[in-house]
Amino acid sequence: SGESLEIDFTGSASQTPGFINSSIPNTYSYIFLTLSSMIDDSIPRNEGLFRPVEVKLPQGSVVNPNPPAPCTACTLHAGGEIGEAVAFALEKAIPKMAYVQNVKLGMPVVTYGTNPYTGEFYVDQNVMMSAGWCNAAYGVDGWGALPPFFGAMTMATGELHDMNFPVLTMGREFITDSGGPGKWRGGLGTSTKIKALAPMFAHTYVIGTKYPMRGFSGGMDGSTNRVVLREGTAGEQVVEKTAFESPLSSGDITLA
């Protein structure tokens, strides 16, 4: 109201034993990142913008946890959801500036083991198995998950990936109708299949299996996420939340 803005997270969930609690600096960063990206371009992004904003963060909540709460993944989650909540609140006043301030990413399926071609230990953080950014905005369709990762990390090709690790990339493609329907369609998700060519172990955590990327300003939600280890075998594992040191044999397929 007037020349001030109150952002109140009262009612947020309590802090969690998991590693997605958001520290105060992370929470503030997402609040002001969202605010800065949605207001008029003529307004300088400096201390004068931040000073009239009052932020209320309940102590002991997921947005302001008591130490020593784990916060390792808060850069994405619950950080992304914090940005999303602020964007939804501002959407009512400036709908044309609203867009998805979130990434339903979790983490890539990270594998590690001994490369039989070199005899050396390796860790493969495969960002090809990540999707969920470059979403729709006013006047623009989402453009999917093939651009650089957050605009900061260029994705390697499947061929380059296969040259460096004991795997075979069997395919990577957009999933039809996975973007949220609307006047401007949301960004499409991808389906990636990678076959292990040697024994290895996999780590991952998955989000967006229940709550997908949300639509804005009348747009509909996108599709949910799915990660499958050892697809099509008796030991097939659909990852519900996390997978830790999950063994993959030569020939096993990972789908994400």
Residues of each region from the PLM?
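Glycine/proline-enriched, intrinsically flexible loops and inter-domain linkers
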Residues: 1-256
